[in-house]
Amino acid sequence: ILKENLINTGVGIIEMGIAWWSSDRKIDDLTIHYKNKEILESNEGILVLAKHTTHVEIDVRLMSRGLKMGGMYRPQKNKIINHIMINARNKYIEGAFHHKQASQTLDYVRNGKKMIYAADQDFGSKYSIFVPFFKEMASTITIPHGISQERFKVVFIKINRKKNGYEVEAKEIEPQEDQLEFLTNMNKAYTDSIIESPEQFLWVHRRFKTRLDGGDVYPIWKSREKRRQNERKSS
């Protein structure tokens, strides 16, 4: 899996270019099947959960095809790359929100629109609780549960690359009053999808950086994480 994942990570750079600059017709040709797309075609606000795959850029293009969706981004240090990224994404998503604009993204959904949100990342402990992720307790953002409690749909999008294109499937995460139960089901949707194509998951993404015991399983990133924590405190 390690070797295949490294290959897929490299291929992801090519897929990024395809996502940013290909025509809609080319994107349509890459989509084998979009199962349950009708779930997303209503006029109600929906939080659309995306997965961190090695082809995440093309995933956003595929899932938003023919649908008006907003998305979040983390600014890149290189201003040129950042400019290219935002301009490219603005061609196929309705609005690009800074990753720190949480309240704006929630308002976006409340206004009857669809927001792409990657809930499989570690946002720290401030707005998260620990929930199993592959039987490992992982810091899990609680925003999706909050949205579901406001009677908005939370829909997980599974995308796997096959030999002849990409399979896309939408599945609603059933609302639950209990926060832990809802988030456990959400994480299970993620892990079930990852198991289908483990080589396509972005394992270099630090999913387990916040630990119950306060430990650090990514020591090489320690200084960068300390800087980001200070940035979050000052924001």
Describe each model-derived feature in a short phrase.
Residues 1-49, 60, 82-88, 93, ...:
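Membrane-anchoring hydrophobic helices of lipid-metabolizing enzymes
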Residues 2, 6, 78, 82, ...:
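A structural signal for well-ordered alpha-helical scaffolds and beta->alpha junctions
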Residues 4, 42-100, 125-132:
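Catalytic core of membrane glycerolipid acyltransferases/transacylases, capturing the structured
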Residues 15, 57, 120-122:
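Acidic side chains
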Residues 28-30, 78, 95-99, 137-138, ...:
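A conditional alpha-helix N-cap/helix-loop micro-motif detector
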Residues 31, 54-59, 75-77, 116-118, ...:
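Short hydrophobic/aromatic-rich motifs at helix boundaries and adjacent loops
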Residues 35, 72-74, 98-100, 171-173, ...:
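Conserved beta-strand termini and adjacent loop/short-helix elements that scaffold enzyme active sites
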Residues 40-43, 103-235:
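Non-catalytic C-terminal accessory region of glycerolipid acyltransferases
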